Amino acid sequence: MRYLVLTRIHTANIQTSAYFDSINKIPDMILTAHKLGMAGLALTDHECLSGHVKWLLAEKELKEDRKIPQDFKCACGNEIYLVENRNNIEKYWHYILIAKNSDGHRAL
């Protein structure tokens, strides 16, 4: 009999340097996700990609130090907003975009 193993990767996560919108520190976010049994975590700051370099460097360092397993996934994404009218932004929708690979990351 085969079993389906479901893993959970949270996709709406922001960190401290993202417009002062969060108190999450990148290494702590990754370590906490691992301790909670998650298979990975995505960094999706609000309309900002500047945290991705620090994010990927932290992932590499934590794996080298064997603090997280090699198969732990640190995905890169972006939370974007869509509006109906650029001149009158009364209401907007949030969308999370996650890069599947390096081509997707360049597209973000």
Label the predicted regions:
Residues 1-108:
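Phosphodiester-processing cores and adjacent nucleic acid-binding clamps
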